[in-house]
Swiss-Prot record:
<protein>
    <recommendedName>
        <fullName>Large ribosomal subunit protein uL11</fullName>
    </recommendedName>
</protein>
<dbReference type="InterPro" id="IPR020784">
    <property type="entry name" value="Ribosomal_uL11_N"/>
</dbReference>
<dbReference type="GO" id="GO:0070180">
    <property type="term" value="F:large ribosomal subunit rRNA binding"/>
</dbReference>
<keyword id="KW-0694">RNA-binding</keyword>
<dbReference type="InterPro" id="IPR000911">
    <property type="entry name" value="Ribosomal_uL11"/>
</dbReference>
<comment type="function">
    <text>Forms part of the ribosomal stalk which helps the ribosome interact with GTP-bound translation factors.</text>
</comment>
<dbReference type="Pfam" id="PF00298">
    <property type="entry name" value="Ribosomal_L11"/>
</dbReference>
<dbReference type="InterPro" id="IPR036769">
    <property type="entry name" value="Ribosomal_uL11_C_sf"/>
</dbReference>
<dbReference type="InterPro" id="IPR036796">
    <property type="entry name" value="Ribosomal_uL11_N_sf"/>
</dbReference>
<dbReference type="Pfam" id="PF03946">
    <property type="entry name" value="Ribosomal_L11_N"/>
</dbReference>
<dbReference type="InterPro" id="IPR006519">
    <property type="entry name" value="Ribosomal_uL11_bac-typ"/>
</dbReference>
<keyword id="KW-0689">Ribosomal protein</keyword>
<keyword id="KW-0699">rRNA-binding</keyword>
<dbReference type="GO" id="GO:0006412">
    <property type="term" value="P:translation"/>
</dbReference>
<dbReference type="InterPro" id="IPR020785">
    <property type="entry name" value="Ribosomal_uL11_CS"/>
</dbReference>
<dbReference type="InterPro" id="IPR020783">
    <property type="entry name" value="Ribosomal_uL11_C"/>
</dbReference>
<dbReference type="GO" id="GO:0022625">
    <property type="term" value="C:cytosolic large ribosomal subunit"/>
</dbReference>
Amino acid sequence: MAKKIVGFIKLQVPAGKANPSPPIGPALGQRGLNIMEFCKAFNAQTQSVEPGLPLPVVITAFADKSFTFIIKTPPAITLIKKAIKLDKGSARPHTDKVGKITRAQLEEIAKTKMKDLTAADLDAAVRTIAGSARSMGVNVEGV
């Protein structure tokens, strides 16, 4: 028989740096889950990822206090900032431009994000990522 699901917890956790402090501790503690068990498992699974890269994680909590989790790809905004070596987006995105991104860079990001996007093909994924780039004040070339 399948376990009864009590809830889902969505967090963004830096790769390899999960620890019991907020936001992880309180979120898991409210559901009675073993915080250290999650931290050790998450850090072990994210060893191959660049340390500190924020990763969305969806934790499924069960009635017997056990859990499973799925690690998703880094947010598109983070990948865009990393690709063009940017600290933060523009405060006024449609007025002040903070950088440029090429089609090749967008395709690389889209390939990384493809499994988490609802896009039907690579071109649609590139357009989705380009929209995210525009909304943070980055000029998009070749799309």
